[in-house]
Amino acid sequence: MVEPHPQFRIMAAANSGGSGDSSGLYSAAVKVQSRAAMNRYNVFVRVNYMEAPEEMALVRKHVPDLSDAASDIMLAFLTNYRKGFADGEITTPISPRNMLTLGSYVSAFEGRIGYASALERGLNTVIFQSIDDNDAPVVRGIADRVTP
């Protein structure tokens, strides 16, 4: 018999709770997990996205040169995007990694072309190039409402 160390812990991510993805959004990456394997875990915790202000604080921590003006617009964009996603109007999620990339892009260019142009280019490069075509009109509408 192998006895585990008293402080031994294991954690695993199962983005779909092991049930796979019925939406088709993650068809290549999220598969149905073995029920036998899933039964070995006795605690499941659903972790939602962090609140938009927290996420933007994370972006500001990692991209300290990002202007307040750009950060405020990114916060408004993220808040509205996540609401659209939660309400089912948008099917493509936006992650903290996306926002960090957007913040880095905007910060790199806003000193040369201004924050408004940097945001427009950043949104086009980081967000619009990666969303589902069906989401584009809704996401573009959000961007149009919050950007100068």
For the regions a protein language model found, what residue spans apply to each?
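C-terminal regulatory/interaction module of P-loop NTP-utilizing enzymes
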Residues: 1-148
